[in-house]
Amino acid sequence: MKTVTLPSGQTVPALGQGTWKMGERRDRRASEIAALRAGIEVGMKLIDTAEMYGDGAAETLVGEAIAGERDGVFLVSKAYPQNASRDQLRRACEASLKRLRTDRLDLYLLHWRGSVPLAETAEAMERLKASGHIRQWGVSNLDADDMDELIAAGGEGCATDQILYNLVRRGPERTLLPWLERHQISAMAYSPVEQGKLLRNPALGAIAARLEATPAQVALAWVMRRDRVVAIPKAGTVEHVLENRKAVDIALSVADFATLDASFPAPRTARPLEML
């Protein structure tokens, strides 16, 4: 499994598992748990969730899925911005830990920026780190100017920025990804196949056919081409998660990258960070 190195020096799988909208339907619960467990077995040991997902339902499902496997999983969750204050963040974290059936998070993120000052959130995160509730912390959906402000406000401990990034959302390549590279901060790409919407593209399909792969696998391989980017697709079935895993083994050629650049051109000017 390809890995990404965090600022701490710790390595994590370049291909993880997302959980948005998991745990919300009883008829899919067994399948979703089986998918997460299958992903762990094949090396996709980074699992990303959030208190927002199903109002905690995804965290509860993840807690069940990783029972007995906690030490082998890199567990990520995210806090609502309204819970990112000095007083609220500890309570939010402890509620997430209870749902996840664990005593610590490997990485805890601010889900998006709200009204709480970044300096206060950074301080609250460092307190959770000191108390052992979390091992590392980061942010999500923050653009380069936000990251500048975060670092200036005492947020040097930020380990990652989780962002919307895929073939049709290449805006981060203009400013944000270079900023993260300069500061040796990793990125996590959520919705790396745009919820399946980009998979009918003819160019993507042609490359997939030549490689005896699926368009989704090619799209994931494209995201993982960068050394500091972790892709976190969601898969609700064992079959789907095993299909995603094969993306790690795909080697795209220079010609493939050129074809994808022509079909999915990067923006020529900077644009605000998009989010879902």
List the predicted regions and their residue ranges.
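N-terminal binding-site loop/beta-alpha segment at the start of enzyme catalytic domains
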Residues: 1-73, 265, 275-276
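Beta/alpha (TIM)-barrel catalytic core signal, keyed to glycine-rich beta->alpha loops juxtaposed to Asp/Glu
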Residues: 3, 113-276
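Acidic (Asp/Glu)-rich catalytic clusters
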Residues: 6-7, 41, 63-71, 94-103, ...
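Short, well-ordered coil/turn segments that N-cap beta-strands
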Residues: 11-15, 43-46, 70-73, 102-106, ...
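Active-site mouth loops of central-metabolism enzymes
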Residues: 18-30, 77-87, 111
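Short, acidic/polar
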Residues: 26-39, 85-100, 145-148
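A short, structured active-site edge motif that brings together acidic residues
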Residues: 71-84, 107-111, 141, 164-165
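Active-site groove signature of glycoside hydrolases
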Residues: 97-116
